[in-house]
């Protein structure tokens, strides 16, 4: 399921927004966690397993880092190596066409790594509640392609969400702008990039290479998942 698919736009997102709106307190946080895990599971059961492999060990070991355990540095290093290795292996397998990219694994991994490093340096408070930690790592509004946010930025929003009619309207406008860019620009640019890569495989020139790079940069911008994420974040937080 993609952020631009009909199932996400007209079923998963609006239904989730309505349920979240009528819930209160801890019920909202629990719902966000299970809904985010559902989103990942619909993408791929493998994605869900990899996501849990990132979150569960890091949550359990974070308490030792927060308590300044004598082996806190070693624990932190082990978690960092585990998360980065998982993200790198997934990327390599994807490049080799051995695996469809597990959406959100890299985002979740680096989100968790950032939290553990901040915790080790005393720059944030430990997230004792597993529900809060789970939402922090797996919230579907940012899991697809970021952004990577710190615990100091994200967790307070779970305790004091600001969901207003004005924010929802602004988010819907952002989402429509993002969809328009994807439909109008991204498809054409992707076809152009594919044709350009074929030409470059026959004859490589400096001008052709730079034009290909610029075209690809503009394609990444025109995909506009940032606009889509902004909309979902306004709706849910």
Task: Mark where each language-model region is.
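Membrane-embedded transmembrane alpha-helical bundles that form the catalytic cores
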Residues: 1-235
């Amino acid at each position: 399921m993609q952020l631009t698919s009909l199932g996400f736009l007209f079923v998963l997102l609006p239904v989730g927004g309505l349920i979240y709106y009528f819930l209160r307190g801890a019920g909202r946080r629990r719902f966000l966690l299970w809904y985010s895990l559902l989103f990942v599971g619909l993408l791929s059961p493998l994605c869900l397993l990899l996501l849990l492999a990132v979150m569960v060990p890091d949550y359990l070991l974070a308490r030792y880092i927060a308590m300044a355990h004598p082996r806190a540095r070693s624990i932190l290093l082990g978690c960092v190596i585990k998360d980065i290795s998982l993200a790198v292996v997934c990327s390599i397998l994807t490049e080799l066409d051995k695996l469809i990219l597990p959406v959100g694994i890299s985002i979740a991994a680096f989100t968790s790594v950032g939290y553990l490093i901040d915790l080790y340096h005393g720059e944030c408070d430990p997230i004792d509640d597993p529900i809060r930690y789970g939402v922090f790592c797996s919230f579907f509004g940012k899991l697809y392609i970021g952004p990577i946010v710190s615990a100091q930025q994200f967790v307070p929003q779970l305790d004091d969400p600001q969901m207003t009619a004005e924010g929802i309207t602004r988010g819907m406008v952002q989402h429509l702008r993002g969809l328009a860019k994807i439909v109008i620009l991204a498809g054409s640019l992707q076809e152009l990039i594919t044709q350009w890569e074929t030409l470059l495989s026959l004859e490589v020139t400096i001008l052709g290479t730079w034009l290909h790079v610029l075209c690809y940069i503009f394609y990444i911008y025109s995909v506009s998942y940032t606009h889509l994420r902004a909309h979902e974040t306004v709706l849910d937080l």
